[in-house]
Amino acid sequence: MAMTQTENQTAPQQHIRIFDTTLRDGEQSPGVALNHAQKLEIAHTLARMGVDVIEAGFPIASPGDLEGVSRIAREVRGPVITALARANRADIEAAAKGVEAAEKSRIHTFIATSPIHMQKKLNLEPDAVIERAVEAVRLARQYVDDVEFSAEDATRSEWDFLSRIFKAAVEAGATTINVPDTVGYTTPEEMRKLFAYLKAKLPAHVILSSHCHDDLGMAVANSIAAAEGGARQIECTINGIGERAGNASLEEIVMAFHTRRDVYGYETGIRTRELYRASRLVSRLSGMPVQPNKAIVGDNAFAHESGIHQDGVIKARETYEIMNAELVGREAAVLVMGKHSGRAAFRKALTDLGYGDIPDDKVQHLFGRFKDLADRKGQIYAEDLRALVDARSDVPQTFSLEGFQITSGMNMMPVAFVRLHTPDGPVDATAHGDGPVEAAFQAISKITGISPTLESYRIQSVTRGDDALGEVSIHVRHGETQLNGTGVATDIVEASARAWIRVMNMIVAGMGKNKAITQMTP
């Protein structure tokens, strides 16, 4: 029976640990390629938001992954920093090296336990799988005191076997036991019963954890059901990104517990006002746009089109809104600046929006972009400033855009004239293309001498009105390296050119991503 609001006010809130795997499982999304600086920025955002555990990566995948995990371990304080490892010595030693500098470190090791995985992938008998799991946990405990063990494809495994392998892992030193719904197969009722079964079988001090995929659209519901069954850690990602259909969405889980604490009685410790900012950051850096109707962080999440709904909200917001937009960091379209605003007012506006930690040299660059935008738009809103800040470059500026001109029309080949600032000074180039954007790309590549392959191109409006800012997101391949670039401007071609130049600078700086290991993980 559900608790009433009055009952819940006196009942103690049980803490649910939030384990964020955006940087590991989320990055396994097709087309996502995060470099070290981008991963670090996301990790700092997660720490500021209050997550309990950050899964920083899969160190054995490549030297670049190992360095990315190590950098997060060195620089991010607050959350536990963990790294993933298969149940073998090489993986575990790489994970240990990756997290050795962390303030609080964990190794997360796993092996498959379902009959189909043991037979078809591992070619091992169940007892041999248990033996490997025990050896892996014991080895991990030689490096860290905090070890998480996962049974890959747990929800298609035999419950008795899960109980056996989890007991063996705990006896070997595992402190957290994770139950992944690796292929998104289970249902909430099955999940609740499975966790209740495991809770009864395992020692009380062990933390049970869920890791749900969204193949049937039930990842969030399954995660909540796991908590009802006894899970005290939930693994999830910002915006629900991840392999195939993605993972359980962090922001949806957190706000479900927050909004319906009268029913669940759980708290997460997440600073909810950071959710929208984190969502935008991950969307921009990953190149994966958030669908407009996505719960909590979608553009339409707090929009009301129906006249009846609009009238109700005007009279009393709670008639059709179960939470305040401000609670998740969404501001109303408030006018904050104009073209006559000065640098001090600009700095204050950034601080008010939560960007007070931006260094002075970056603020100076952003102020220049703001003045250019104010000359075009006149009135600048909070969402415009957010878009400018989100588009700031974290890449060394070998090349920068000084100007461009497009000649295009019906029944004529588009021509782009582009001028870039380079280490040798201003350089001009002209090129043709199938459209004005491709012509601009070709002209830029002429100047830089770099011609990557464009694999995807997306554009979306990030502010409102006829003079809205547009954000272009591109995914390119340069040899074996994958890169994402973004650009923001009121002009589509300019935004596209800025995204292409960003990719050029990333290539020069060696900031691409080479996905070396693609084996399925929990």
From Swiss-Prot:
State if Heme is listed as a keyword.
no
Sorted keywords for this record are:
Amino-acid biosynthesis, Branched-chain amino acid biosynthesis, Cytoplasm, Leucine biosynthesis, Manganese, Metal-binding, Transferase
Q: What range(s) does the Pyruvate carboxyltransferase domain occupy?
A: 16-276
* Enzymatic reactions: 3-methyl-2-oxobutanoate + acetyl-CoA + H2O = (2S)-2-isopropylmalate + CoA + H(+)
Q: What is its EC number?
A: 2.3.3.13
May I have one GO cellular component term? cytoplasm
Q: Could you tell me which pathway this protein works in?
A: Amino-acid biosynthesis; L-leucine biosynthesis; L-leucine from 3-methyl-2-oxobutanoate: step 1/4
- The protein's predominant localisation is cytoplasm
**Chain ranges passing through the membrane:** none
Where does it live in the cell? Cytoplasm
Q: Which residues form a coiled coil?
A: none
Q: What cofactor requirement does the entry state?
A: Mn(2+)
Q: Which HAMAP family match?
A: LeuA_type1 (MF_01025)
Function, as annotated:
Catalyzes the condensation of the acetyl group of acetyl-CoA with 3-methyl-2-oxobutanoate (2-ketoisovalerate) to form 3-carboxy-3-hydroxy-4-methylpentanoate (2-isopropylmalate).
Q: Which family does it belong to?
A: Belongs to the alpha-IPM synthase/homocitrate synthase family. LeuA type 1 subfamily.
- Name the UniProt record assigns to this protein: 2-isopropylmalate synthase
What species does this protein belong to?
Deinococcus radiodurans (strain ATCC 13939 / DSM 20539 / JCM 16871 / CCUG 27074 / LMG 4051 / NBRC 15346 / NCIMB 9279 / VKM B-1422 / R1)
Q: Which gene encodes it?
A: leuA
